[in-house]
Amino acid sequence: KNLFLDTASILEERIVRGSYTMDVFGGQNLEFGAERAQTILDSNLALGLFSDTEAPSSAFGGLSPVAIPNANTRVEEIRYEPFAIHNWRISPRMSLETSFVYESSEISMSGDVSNSRNFDFFKPKVDYRFDVTPQLQLRVLIEKFVRQLSFTDFVATSDQEDEDSNTLAGNSNLRPDYWWNYNFLAEYRLPNDQGVVSANFYHHRHKDFLQRIDVSTGPDDLRSAAGNIGTGDMQVF
């Protein structure tokens, strides 16, 4: 035996959400509320390898312990999200939905890594729909998305896919990536309910995009980790 790999993790999540909906004017209603979420990850990783120079340990399957950065870490996020959503039936053929969401969160780490950071995002949305005819509908959507971070990207984990690496490094400095979505959609319903033909064009403008990055310390220590690689634009038709 020349490899010992032991992982253990516990993920907990608690969410409380409340909202209230009221009619304000003819064809309009307003929903407002708030959400609070707590997410906790306790992660542990142990790696043992055969070595002629390092002393073996029974806790590592009789192999020599290998020090892994960020292997025993607790990650916790507290997130608050107040919101307001306005729906307006302008006419039998037109509708408009607007929403305003404010996200405030604190992500803290303890254990092998000690770190605490705060993030604040404003996430508006405008969704306009127009029925040109009973068969043809046009839709314009503008929305800001903020991706929720995967807590396993913060800590070191085992690598099940790369034969050249036993572990994936964690990144304690990750930031949520976000993007603006500009979407135009046309949908046509075929006669006699034979189906739907649709065309969709959208443009995404990304910020702090998340991707795997190389964090190898040398040719004999190949590692990758999740990281923010910058900005970019994507267009799809």
Give the positions of each predicted feature.
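Hydrophobic, lipid-facing positions within transmembrane beta-strands of outer-membrane proteins
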Residues: 12-18, 78-84, 122-126, 138, ...
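Transmembrane beta-barrel strands of outer-membrane/channel proteins
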Residues: 32-38, 98-104, 128, 140-144, ...
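Outer membrane beta-barrel strand-and-loop segments of large Gram-negative receptors
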Residues: 13-19, 63, 70-71, 171, ...
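Flexible, surface-exposed loop regions and adjacent strand-edge segments
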Residues: 1-3, 47-57, 113-119, 154-164, ...
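Residue-level signature of outer-membrane beta-barrel architecture
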Residues: 20-22, 88, 120, 128-131, ...
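Surface-exposed extracellular loop regions of Gram-negative outer-membrane beta-barrel proteins
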Residues: 40-42, 106, 134-181, 201-227
